[in-house]
Amino acid sequence: MYTLIKKCGNAKRGRFETPHGTIETPVFMNVGTLGVIKGAVSSMDLKEIGCQVELSNTYHLHLRPGDEVIKKMGGLHKFMNWDRPILTDSGGFQVFSLAKIRKIQEEGVYFNSHIDGRRIFMGPEESMRIQSNIASTIAMAFDECIPNPSTREYVENSVARTTRWLERCKKEMDRLNSLPDTINKKQMLFGINQGGTYEDIRKAHAKTIVDMDLDGYAIGGLAVGETHEEMYRVIDEVAPIFPDNKPLYLMGVGLPSNILEAVDRGVDFFDCVLPARNGRHGHVFTKYGKINLMNAKFELDGNPIDEGCECPACKHYSRAYIRHLFKAKEMLAMRLCVLHNLYFYNKLMEDIRKAIEGDYFKEFKEEKLHNWSGKA
């Protein structure tokens, strides 16, 4: 159940109760595609850096180790030793972006695994069964992530099919949650809004999925090539359609500036591989923007990555030392920078929640955007 605690303009401060604990929103979900954050970050680390929700990938976990293996191990929470909420995406995005030789039909999608080339079928029922085996807290509906740009006719047909798939997802989840051997009988379902950059299609689809009375809703199909202005325009159009008593998730959008703009438009949930991926390459976020620790100017820099940051890297090591680790190709370099970036994001969300509660989110947003626009 989602409770709206406070609004500051359109920005929402909420609390989402789940079978695996409470999620304070707005929230950034830390992405562990295969049940782990890339960069040697453990579940214990995630708790220490303030992670509330871990996001894993249905497509990848289905391929390895296999969702049946995870079910036999008691579900993903037990498998990865994580007792807080987990959201699994449906696998749709990966099917349409990674998989080879796709064939879309009404029943689902036939594709070849990007790992070993074997032929696989995934449709709404299969996605729900896999996510039920994984036993995540929140399951995402199976949808088609529409390529950008696409013709209006293609988008209309795709959205209509995604709606039919959502109805099948809901029916299958209700069935799975009633079975005696289901691990998480209270698994939640979020529906995904699609429609490309066609505002009227987006709005009509949003109204349709709201009528299905799901546990939450997501805006999908963005951050796939459109401009930031186009993305914000889509959010402006559809966010007001979604109810204030349900969480709203903007999928795959993760620049700090994007997060602030989307929070200002009523979004609650975020995820992105960006902080971990950047960290693995020495690109780290600070209160004054992003820096590249590989740059020569940091060779003798005795300061922490970000002055005042309480992450494990900043509390114990200098920019110069971490740069040395990267140059020496030591794994610790990646680990420290990934931990820092995830801490930065989790702390940003905590500060956003405080700003909404304190009625100063507009000022907070303007200050952050101004600071990030300069050179660190």
Curated annotation (Swiss-Prot):
Residues covered by region (RNA binding): 252-258, 276-280
Gene Ontology molecular function terms on file: metal ion binding; tRNA-guanosine(34) queuine transglycosylase activity
Active site residues per record: 89 (proton acceptor), 271 (nucleophile)
Catalytic activity: 7-aminomethyl-7-carbaguanine + guanosine(34) in tRNA = 7-aminomethyl-7-carbaguanosine(34) in tRNA + guanine
Amino-acid positions noted as binding substrate in the UniProt annotation, renumbered to this chain: 89-93, 143, 194, 221
Superkingdom of the organism of origin: Bacteria
Keyword Transferase: yes
Cofactors that this protein relies on: Zn(2+)
Pathway where it operates: tRNA modification; tRNA-queuosine biosynthesis
Pfam family, one: TGT
Gene Ontology biological process terms in this record: queuosine biosynthetic process; tRNA wobble guanine modification; tRNA-guanine transglycosylation
Cofactor binding, per record: Binds 1 zinc ion per subunit.
Top-level enzyme category: transferase
GO CC annotation: cytosol
Keywords: Glycosyltransferase, Metal-binding, Queuosine biosynthesis, Transferase, tRNA processing, Zinc
Record-listed Zn(2+) binding positions: 309, 311, 314, 340
This enzyme's EC code(s): 2.4.2.29
Record PANTHER family: QUEUINE TRNA-RIBOSYLTRANSFERASE
Function in brief: Catalyzes the base-exchange of a guanine (G) residue with the queuine precursor 7-aminomethyl-7-deazaguanine (PreQ1) at position 34 (anticodon wobble position) in tRNAs with GU(N) anticodons (tRNA-Asp, -Asn, -His and -Tyr). Catalysis occurs through a double-displacement mechanism. The nucleophile active site attacks the C1' of nucleotide 34 to detach the guanine base from the RNA, forming a covalent enzyme-RNA intermediate. The proton acceptor active site deprotonates the incoming PreQ1, allowing a nucleophilic attack on the C1' of the ribose to form the product.
HAMAP family in UniProt: Q_tRNA_Tgt
Subunit structure: Homodimer. Within each dimer, one monomer is responsible for RNA recognition and catalysis, while the other monomer binds to the replacement base PreQ1.
Family: Belongs to the queuine tRNA-ribosyltransferase family.
The protein's name in its UniProt record: Queuine tRNA-ribosyltransferase
Species of the source: Clostridium tetani (strain Massachusetts / E88)
Classification lineage: Bacteria, Bacillati, Bacillota, Clostridia, Eubacteriales
